[in-house]
């Protein structure tokens, strides 16, 4: 069987969709699985174990000058790449026109199909015109966790919904080049403070207070950043917190994942890096400043927890949660 995953963006959603790959291999051990994803995320997706091909697409970049000669040539080259193989199943995990447009361009084997969501789910992006582009609409619950939604879409599209597999926690599997557990004695905590949504942010004063608590407990801090505003923020923090706070350079997502995987864990807001912490199997506290933990928070792991909800958590709640996950991690995965 040959299966194509179409999940283009964004970072957190792409990472959560990775849980589908082990499910597919459990049900179809000989399946060849390809993935179409935005070019910025392709190096990270290439680290997922069990993929045959990763097909990068430049939709975000193309939109800036859609009719330029260069972008027209790139789109034609991508179309040729997409047409190289025929698929038994093409599954659009995005449910948007931009992703259905990609899925609709694929070649199918005899009896092959193209599937996506048949309806919207709460707090999930969805565009109804996908019905006009693809041929199999899969009904979904009105309220469901994002990871469960991706896994259920694959299961219903490929007729294994009744398998006990879906009752088990999501799994993420990485190639050997992506470390899977903190290094022995790791003392560096990653503060994943960045987010594209202002309503997801946690107060800077609380981050600084938490940083001091971690340093007082003998930990170092890693400060990743993306963009000028986040870089200015971590520069301020490093000046206040001192040499124990390391500003990480901007780096590719695959390299960043390897650096995170060698840390003692991650404390972060609802963002792509927090979802990456979950997928890497790290001790993790995820901070929510709105009622979204039911949809996006970590599940099924004692050393990965969500704090907050309709209101942001206090710094003490985050600190207590961090101590909790450290204890749970030591019990479940002793050195």
Language model feature labels by segment:
Residues 1-335:
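Catalytic machinery of carbohydrate-active enzymes
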């Amino acid at each position: 069987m040959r299966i194509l995953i179409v999940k283009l963006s964004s970072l957190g959603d792409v990472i959560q969709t990775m849980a589908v790959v082990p499910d597919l291999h459990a049900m179809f051990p000989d399946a060849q699985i390809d993935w179409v994803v935005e070019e910025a995320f392709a190096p990270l997706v290439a680290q997922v174990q069990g993929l045959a091909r990763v097909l990068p697409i430049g939709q975000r970049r193309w939109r800036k000058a859609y009719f330029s000669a260069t972008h027209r040539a790139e789109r034609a080259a991508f179309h040729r790449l997409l047409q190289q193989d025929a698929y038994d199943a093409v599954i659009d995990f995005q449910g948007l026109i931009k992703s259905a447009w990609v899925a609709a361009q694929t070649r199918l084997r005899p009896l092959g199909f193209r599937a996506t969501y048949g309806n919207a789910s709460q707090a999930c992006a969805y565009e109804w015109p996908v019905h006009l582009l693809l041929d199999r609409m899969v009904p979904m619950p009105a309220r469901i966790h994002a990871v469960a939604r991706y896994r259920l879409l694959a299961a219903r599209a490929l007729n294994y919904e009744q398998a006990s597999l879906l009752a088990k926690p999501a799994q993420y599997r990485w190639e050997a080049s992506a470390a899977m557990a903190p290094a022995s004695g790791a003392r560096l905590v990653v503060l994943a403070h960045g987010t594209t949504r202002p309503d997801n942010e946690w107060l800077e004063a609380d981050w600084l207070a938490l940083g001091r608590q971690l340093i007082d407990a003998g930990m170092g801090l890693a400060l990743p950043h993306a963009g000028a505003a986040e870089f200015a923020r971590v520069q301020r923090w490093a000046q206040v917190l001192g040499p124990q706070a390391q500003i990480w350079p901007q780096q590719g997502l695959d390299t960043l994942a390897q650096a995170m995987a060698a840390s003692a864990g991650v404390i972060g807001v609802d963002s792509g890096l927090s979802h990456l912490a979950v997928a890497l199997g790290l001790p993790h506290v995820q901070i929510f400043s709105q009622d979204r933990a039911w949809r996006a928070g970590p599940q099924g792991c004692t050393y990965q927890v969500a704090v907050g909800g309709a209101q942001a958590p206090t710094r003490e709640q985050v600190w207590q949660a961090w101590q909790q996950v450290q204890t749970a991690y030591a019990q479940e995965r002793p050195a």
